Amino acid sequence: MNASNNISKFPDLDNSSKLIDHILDSDDSEELDELPDISSLVPSARAQSRKQYLKNDSSNSSTYRWNIDLLSSTATIDDSVAKRRKLAVQNLLQYDSTQTFQTGDEIDELIGKSVGSNVLNVLRSNPIYDDDLRYEYCSNSKARVPDWNTLKAECLKDNDLEFNEGIIPTTFGDLLSAKLVPLDIALSICSLQFFRSLGDTTCSEWIANLEKIFYSYKSSSNNLNQIVRFIFETTADMIGIDLAKRQVPIQLERTSASENLKSNLKIKVINFLKCCGTLYRFSDDTVRFEMIQDACRILIDNQVGSFCKWQFSQFMELPISLNPDFLISNIHKVSESPRVWVTILSSLSRSCQKFRKKIAFTLFVGKQSKNDDSDFSSLCQRLDEISASCNNDYTTLLYQIRTFGYAVDEKHFKTNERLECLLEKLRKIDLTISGSTDHLLLSRCEVKDCIHRLFMVLYYLNTNSAPELERIIESDLPNNNKQKDRYFKDKTSNLSMKENKSFSAKKVKKGKKKNKRQAYKR
């Protein structure tokens, strides 16, 4: 089957979104309404080295319809359209009856040009926006401050010793390295000091001391799991984790703004994630999954999530490196919301890209990857389900498509027919999004843009188009360098000409003065 017949064109977009139409309607092609023939592109070009491809290729880049200049101009147009949409909606949110008629007219005109003439009434009838969705997992009000006498008795137990609260963590670490403190006593003192410094910057040093003790303890104690659980649960209580929410999938709610965030809660939560990174190695699977759940929920928390992204990515490297199958098989229990999935996936570090695809596949499809042909069938089936169930819920659809973007891998495109099949399914989903201005909300425009961009990314990454683009870019670079050299050369020559002129002018003035003096003497 010819790809150009199957993937004929994207649907016509409205006046406010010309992302694909601008590309397809270019004068650089004779077939204006067709995408490039995917089946005619040679997949082996991907395996060639870039230099070898450039050496062997003798095609004329001017005839290549999807050229870099066209893409650049399209991206610029798309960016300006997106800004116009957002500006219109921002103005709309500030619009009320107290404003002057002139301001109302201006806003109506702006919305009419940017997102459709009837969108004003639609937005007024649905005043709740996605930004109102919130999730709270840690809070000052639920933080349980332990009774220090009880905690001291729990930590020190039967050890008859005086507890020195002023001991410095570096000094204590030196004592540990020299093995001058028995392990039981060292663990008791270090645990108590860790709890006391949870909201302090010295907490990281006490966590490092705990790690030293655990490595020594691992081979000499059978109750290490109990010790780890005690420290984990006590710390979770101190940062105010809602234990009832730990047992159910994350559900975003429309609630009012939460209480003011105390400054030390942010530090406590960051130190809690650092502590989980240390405890994870010495925990059983039950505690490990609770740590993973807590880390994901803290990331989604509206109060503290934005402060903890880096620490979250550092923690998640542990389950990915130590037992990835355990993580992948349980990650779907955290939430059923595609919006939560995208937040988690986008916060993983770059070193986890391989496993991020596996995690995304599990979340998107609902089951683990088998690394065989059934994975492709599962992706296609899920895309068909999304296409059939799209019911004007554009926000959910947007995050589903973004999750698919994380899940899809080059191993799924063993043949051109597979690539053609996935692109056709994306086009089908795009067609299900109504083009009526009555439903032309910002979320609808965003999901169409996301589908179009993903379509182009899949096309370029899985055909020989990527080397073609590289060749075009590289062919432009020398010209740019020559222009720069010419610019500096002209600038230098202009400066030298100015210097010569000024020098000549000074010489003339000097000669005139000399003649005047000689005439005066005479």
UniProtKB/Swiss-Prot annotation:
One GO BP: DNA damage response
Gene Ontology molecular function: chromatin-protein adaptor activity
Basic and acidic residues bias spans: 482-492
UniProt entry tagged with the keyword DNA damage: yes
Region feature (Disordered): 482-522
InterPro entries named among the record's database cross-references: DNA_repair_Nse5/Nse6
Basic residues: bias regions: 504-522
A GO term from the CC aspect: nucleus
Subcellular location: Nucleus; Chromosome
Record keywords, A-Z: Chromosome, DNA damage, DNA recombination, DNA repair, Nucleus
Keyword Nucleus in record: yes
Chain's role: Acts in a DNA repair pathway for removal of UV-induced DNA damage that is distinct from classical nucleotide excision repair and in repair of ionizing radiation damage. Functions in homologous recombination repair of DNA double strand breaks and in recovery of stalled replication forks. May prevent formation of excessive Holliday junctions or assist in their resolution.
Quaternary organization: Component of the smc5/smc6 complex which consists of two subcomplexes, smc5-smc6-nse2 and nse1-nse2-nse4. Interacts with nse5.
Record protein name field: Non-structural maintenance of chromosome element 6
Organism of origin: Schizosaccharomyces pombe (strain 972 / ATCC 24843)
